[in-house]
Amino acid sequence: VGTVVLERLVRELNGVECTDFEPEPPPSKATAVTRCFGEPVREVAALREAMVRRAVRAAEKIRAQDLAATRLIAFAHGSRFKPNAPSASRIARLSPATNDPRVIGGMAGRMADVMYETGGVYTKCGVMLEGLEPMTAHQADLFAVPDPRSPALLAAIDGLNGRFGRN
């Protein structure tokens, strides 16, 4: 008695090919950047800064894979060991899909402002980007006026981050 995975493993060890070789892994469907704070955060400005940093890092991750996100999820919470600790999350639709850290970071900062509870003590926050799709496949906004300088700016930012680091 075993599982399907165990059965496949036994067959593979006996020389029977069960799955096709994938030279490239399939593209990600979501990515997340979450971190606990080194010390508790009590100010909205500190929470906003942390949320924006995580959002920009998540945007960098999907841009490196040439993907765009259609949904942004942000969360922040206090210690799970303390009663009545603050806990909040927000979901936003990104239309059109984007991997621009200026857009994603700006939205995450606004979400942090909305989630913040006065007097709350936060120990962790994070950002998830979902609904990832290839940049070539996403549908553009019919009425948007694209900035022709934007791709060059993002490439320059990526180059600087690659050369000097993110901080």
What is each model feature region?
Residues 94-167:
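Acidic, metal-coordinating catalytic segment for phosphate/diphosphate chemistry
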Residues 1-119:
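DNA-contacting surface of Y-family translesion DNA polymerases
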